[in-house]
């Protein structure tokens, strides 16, 4: 498999590649992807988890205990649980969103899929995700995997990134353009 050099060069990319290679060796690529998705969703929605992951005040042991408590609740597989514990032990849990995104990209590359990073102010419903996936698939004439993240600062709408292309339909962007137009 051809691995993108830019993904591999980043810290998150290196961790993701290591996890991907082990998952591939054990035949657990999809299982790990599903577990990463569950944890990624929890990470995006739980402010406390993000603070814990990015805060140097808490000891790594406290972070590891929090991960251990989340694993059964989120039904995360053993390989991913060990990986999350490794990230916590190394103080790298704050890089999890980048790692999860890179892992999804490796899976997509393996399957010759396109990955669309979608940023919204609020979580997308399953229906919205499937509608967006269908429209992107129609436009790109390729299978598409959506990497949805939530960023309340965009206020509404969405930003879609596909490789080097970006479509910014966020309210924040529209307000910025309106403000620029009013300045003259």
Swiss-Prot record:
SUPFAM superfamilies annotated for this entry?
N-terminal domain of the delta subunit of the F1F0-ATP synthase
- InterPro entries xrefs: ATP_synth_OSCP/delta_N_sf, ATPase_OSCP/d_CS, ATPase_OSCP/dsu
* One annotated GO molecular function: proton-transporting ATP synthase activity, rotational mechanism
Q: Which Gene3D superfamilies match?
A: N-terminal domain of the delta subunit of the F1F0-ATP synthase
Q: How does the record say this protein sits in the membrane? A: Peripheral membrane protein
**Pfam families, per the entry:** OSCP (PF00213)
Q: At the top level of its lineage, which domain of life is listed?
A: Bacteria
- First-listed, main subcellular location of the protein, grouped into a coarse class: membrane
Per UniProt, which keywords does this protein have? ATP synthesis, Cell inner membrane, Cell membrane, CF(1), Hydrogen ion transport, Ion transport, Membrane, Transport
Q: Where in the cell is it found?
A: Cell inner membrane
Q: Which residues cross the membrane?
A: none
| Presence of keyword Endoplasmic reticulum | no
Coiled coil ranges = none
Q: What's in the GO CC field?
A: plasma membrane; proton-transporting ATP synthase complex
Keyword check for ATP-binding, yes or no.
no
- What function is annotated for this protein? F(1)F(0) ATP synthase produces ATP from ADP in the presence of a proton or sodium gradient. F-type ATPases consist of two structural domains, F(1) containing the extramembraneous catalytic core and F(0) containing the membrane proton channel, linked together by a central stalk and a peripheral stalk. During catalysis, ATP synthesis in the catalytic domain of F(1) is coupled via a rotary mechanism of the central stalk subunits to proton translocation.
Quaternary assembly: F-type ATPases have 2 components, F(1) - the catalytic core - and F(0) - the membrane proton channel. F(1) has five subunits: alpha(3), beta(3), gamma(1), delta(1), epsilon(1). F(0) has three main subunits: a(1), b(2) and c(10-14). The alpha and beta chains form an alternating ring which encloses part of the gamma chain. F(1) is attached to F(0) by a central stalk formed by the gamma and epsilon chains, while a peripheral stalk is formed by the delta and b chains.
The UniProt entry's sequence similarity note says: Belongs to the ATPase delta chain family.
Entry's NCBIfam families? Answer: ATP_synt_delta, PRK05758.3-2
Its name, as the record gives it, is ATP synthase subunit delta
What organism does the UniProt record list as the source? Zymomonas mobilis subsp. mobilis (strain ATCC 31821 / ZM4 / CP4)
Q: Which gene encodes it?
A: atpH
């Amino acid at each position: 498999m051809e691995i993108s050099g830019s993904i591999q060069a980043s810290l998150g990319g290196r961790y993701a590649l290591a996890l991907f290679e082990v998952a591939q060796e054990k035949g657990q690529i999809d299982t790990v992807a599903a577990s990463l998705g569950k944890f990624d969703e929890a990470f995006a929605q739980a402010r406390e988890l993000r603070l814990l992951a990015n805060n140097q005040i808490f000891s790594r042991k406290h972070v590891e205990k929090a991960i251990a408590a989340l694993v059964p609740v989120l039904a995360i597989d053993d390989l991913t649980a060990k990986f999350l514990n490794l990230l916590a032990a190394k103080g790298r849990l704050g890089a999890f969103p980048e790692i999860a995104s890179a892992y999804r990209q490796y899976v997509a590359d393996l399957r010759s899929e396109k990955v669309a990073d979608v940023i919204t102010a609020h979580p997308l419903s399953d229906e919205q995700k499937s509608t967006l996936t269908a429209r992107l698939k129609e436009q790109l004439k390729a299978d598409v995997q959506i990497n949805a993240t939530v960023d309340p600062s965009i206020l509404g709408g969405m930003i879609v990134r596909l490789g080097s292309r970006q479509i910014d339909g966020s309210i924040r962007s529209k307000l910025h353009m309106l403000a620029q137009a009013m300045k003259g």
